[in-house]
């Protein structure tokens, strides 16, 4: 099993219900493709280090997953890239010797 950490930033002007639905949707994408969510953190609204698409703040989310292959992370990245509500994301494969 491989462990990945996914961090993504949601635009700050999204409504609370839409933001919660977005998080559930992307967690569902991960689990539907065979990933197991180990940990999920909502860091809340934070200031960005630099402006992204004219936004100075964003809602930060961190998800750690276990998966056999990269299908779940590939699908997450594909859909996050075309989603206007996610302004930045990164997927990191954690070292196996931890």
Curated annotation (Swiss-Prot):
CDD domains recorded: bS6
Gene name tied to this protein: rpsF
Entry keyword set: Ribonucleoprotein, Ribosomal protein, RNA-binding, rRNA-binding
Protein name: Small ribosomal subunit protein bS6
Function: Binds together with bS18 to 16S ribosomal RNA.
NCBIfam families: S6 (TIGR00166)
GO molecular function: small ribosomal subunit rRNA binding; structural constituent of ribosome
Biological process according to GO: translation
Entry's family note: Belongs to the bacterial ribosomal protein bS6 family.
Superkingdom of source: Bacteria
Coiled coil (residue ranges): none
Pfam families cross-referenced by the UniProt entry: Ribosomal_S6
Annotated GO CC locations: cytoplasm; ribonucleoprotein complex; ribosome
């Amino acid at each position: 099993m491989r462990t990945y950490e996914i961090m993504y930033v949601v635009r700050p002007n999204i409504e609370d219900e839409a933001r919660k639905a977005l998080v559930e949707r992307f967690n569902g994408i991960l689990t539907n493709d065979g990933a197991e969510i180990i940990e999920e953190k909502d860091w809340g609204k934070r200031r960005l280090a630099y402006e992204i698409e004219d936004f100075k703040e964003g809602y930060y989310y961190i998800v750690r997953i276990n998966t056999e292959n990269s299908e779940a992370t590939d699908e997450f990245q594909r859909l996050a890239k075309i989603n206007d509500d996610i302004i930045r994301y990164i997927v990191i494969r954690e070292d196996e010797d931890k």
